[in-house]
Amino acid sequence: HHIPSGVLRNGKISVIGNGAVIDPDIIVDEIKALRKKGYKVTGKNLKISELAHLILPFHKLIDIGREIIKGKNAIGTTGRGIGPCYEDKISRQGIRFVDLSNKKILKDKLKMTLKEKNKILSLVFNQKKISINTLVDDLMKRFKFLKEFIVNTEDFLNKSVNQGKSILFEGAQGVMLDIDFGTYPFVTSSSTISSNASSGTGVPYKKFGKSIGISKAYATRVGHGPFPTEMIDDEGLALREFGDEYGATTGRPRRCGWLDLIALKHSVEICGLDEIILTKVDILSMLSLIHISEPTRPSS
């Protein structure tokens, strides 16, 4: 979930930019899992921005606690602490990888943060308070493992661009989950559109070449939120099974529906796409009739 897919290709360098929020436990597990499968993962072919913010245990506890309180009105978050981590980033109290290089500074920052977080955990969510010493020790252990990967990635990327090297920016999630242009509030906590590749890496947008969008030949969604073309019948269930449509993080079944050309047109406009890669067309071969939702407004 954290490491770019390019790590599977020999001779390629993968970079996780400053715009990502990273769970140190998960990324350590990912690196170990890749190594176990025979892939070489070192600081030479994987680089992590020192400015990337860390998802910490209290972020996940708060994330899950909020969903429980909301009950049937829950957004359907993965519970990985992504939203609360971005909140701390915006409120200027987040912890970044660069903070791990000085244990004293890290502890001072966490001391201030935990004053607030522990009150929220105990008074609002009835959870145990987090020990600062335990948290600091755990983070320092992770830092020891990850230290070789943590660098100034914006400098590395810009030097690579200026040297004429080719770079593929790989985004995550869909346009309709964008914090501004998606189906708010049923969205993720960050920008998912193509222009975020610049602010999320530090590479000037004018240096970019073409913008390529990727879409399935049908629509899917995990969790709650509007889905006008959803197939709420046996055909939709069959499409889910045939297309193996289950959430990559939680394993939750994805809701399936017909391709929504209105949403697709919106995505093309917002991202300024030059071309689209259409995937899973073969999955639709199981159906005798295929529907699409097309724009009907005069402006379309």
Residue ranges of predicted features:
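Single conserved hydrophobic/aromatic residue that forms the stacking wall/gate
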Residues: 290-300
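Internal alpha/beta core interface subdomains
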Residues: 27, 31-156, 160, 167
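Generic N-terminal targeting/processing segments that precede catalytic cores or assembly contacts
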Residues: 1-36, 64-68
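A conserved active-site cap/scaffold subdomain adjacent to cofactor or substrate pockets
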Residues: 181-253
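Short active-site loop/helix that positions an aromatic residue
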Residues: 261-270
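Acidic catalytic cores of enzymes that act on phosphate-bearing nucleotides/polynucleotides
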Residues: 146-193, 201
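Short acidic, glycine/serine/threonine-rich loops at helix termini
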Residues: 58-63, 90-92, 178-182, 187-189, ...
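Internal helical hairpin/lid segments
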Residues: 274-288
